Amino acid sequence: MARPGRVLPKRQLGRCRFLAALAAIMILDPAAPFAAPERIVNVYNWSDYIAPKIIEDFTRETGIKVRYDTFDSNDTLEAKLLAGRSGYDVVVPTGYFLERQIKAGVFQKLDKRKLPNLANIWPTIAARLAKYDPGNDYAVNYMWGTTGIGFNSAKARQATGAAGGIDSWATVFNPKSLERFQHCGVEMLDASDDILPAALYYLGLDPNSANEADLQKSADLIKSIRPFVRKFHSSEYINALATGEICLAVGFSGDIKQAQKRAIEAKNGVDVGYAIPKEGAQLWFDNLAIPRDATNVDEAHAFINYLQKPEVAATNSNFVSYANGNLASQKFIDRAILEDKTIYPDEALMSRLYVINAHDPKIERLMNRLWIRIKTGR
């Protein structure tokens, strides 16, 4: 007679089934149980502000996937950072926002041992950034540029009757002048921290004035031109200029250069120009930083370090038409961009540019209230 089989207890039977299943998995894919967890970096950057190739190449080189979201306002970014648990590992604040965000404790110090490509940074730009981030402890410059006037060259000539194009803030802030552009479309950045200081500067006042009377004067000036502004938006003007939908925009230098490139690529006959007004304009710096509550800190450092490779920084500048803070990249940047004084200003032009300081909360609230009233026409 055959010996009867031993009946296993249920717990031991379950364990045997698990081991059998595990063995089957290992036969099909021996590495499966030991596969490394997926590496991810969550990035929050300005819209239209990176060459797509860079994200693809970074993942290919490092194995780190990039989840990439965009914003078009420092206020949007700041609201997420101050609320906490933003979900992002790398963010890109502008200098004067960076300064107060550092004071608010929303960033962690960079581990410079993980950023060997900082050897490529431009000391001049790093020194300017130190105004907002003493010691450059929390941020690395990503791009920098100016806030000026973009225009449709043909329609600007028709509106002004001048062959030389636009060279003054008077085109924007003189109501009689701006009215001439109303029929072909005017857009303006939706950014109190860009437009109010520009109006102050045009009035001969300190663009960093914290005087309430000065700020009211700048708001009153903008209210006087409000009827001629079709829209306040901080990114839509790029395509609108490129397609000829509008003829004038107050915007960021590289954005307007992108509009210029898109029009050329489309062969639509639209010639887009960019002017840094003769009175002067704002010089700003956008910077890479890691939120205090970032969950993928090593991956964040890897991403920042990758962006500071000279060839990568140059690829980015060639695509977005902004200057960067990487000195070693300049030998790889297209000559037309490097020699364009509206992108890389010379010393004479730099002397006419101003930078914005971080405002205290009281003044910031006042500026926001004035801006809302301007936009709503109240």
Model region roles, listed by residue range:
Residues 239, 347-378:
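Conserved C-terminal helix/tail region of periplasmic/extracytoplasmic solute-binding proteins
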Residues 5, 9-19:
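Twin-arginine (Tat) signal peptide motif
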Residues 99-144, 170-173:
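Hinge/lid segment of periplasmic solute-binding proteins
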Residues 34-101:
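Early extracytoplasmic/lumenal segment of secretory-pathway proteins
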Residues 286, 291-352:
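Mature extracytoplasmic/periplasmic domains
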Residues 187-199, 203-273:
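Ligand-binding pocket segment of bilobal, Venus flytrap-like solute-binding proteins
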Residues 108-119, 170, 266-282, 291-294:
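Short beta-strand->loop
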Residues 102-110, 127-129, 134-136, 228, ...:
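Ligand-binding "clamshell"
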